[in-house]
Amino acid sequence: RDLIKINTAAHQAFYYRPRVSLRELLDSNMLKNLIVLTGCPSSTLNKLLKNDDTKQAKILLDMLAKGSKQLAVEIQYHQSTDDEFRRMQSGLLHHQFDLAYSMGLPLALTNDCHYVTEEDEGIHQAYLVAAEGRVHGIEFDGTGFYLKDSAAMRGVAEYLGQPDAY
């Protein structure tokens, strides 16, 4: 029910896309029965971590932990040949691991899924061109932005040295 309430609130605040603010979520008590993840590399938490603002990141996690019975630090890993992306990802993962362990929070390994199978990448790029009126698709830093099976995700967890990430 709480997830439906959040979805309804997000559509009531529709501006180009459905949206709901963190303040609304925390004030509404809608997170209490949900598993809350901290989000992808572009999330509020991870922007703070990329800027080395661990103090504000801890404050944010404390607020989320008070609103939810189950909070986990979400981690994502994507292979890339781009050195700048790899440095950013490595630094972010380091911050995420440190923060999760220091606050006693579990890690949740997810994959940034933009399409269902690896073979769908071209179709997804065509969709982005059509939907957003671009001449070219969006360049993704890294690879593997599709729905991976549990064996592939366990492999990523092992590679990252985090076999207990769920």
Q: At which residue positions do the language-model features occur?
A:
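Phosphodiester-processing cores and adjacent nucleic acid-binding clamps
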Residues: 1-166
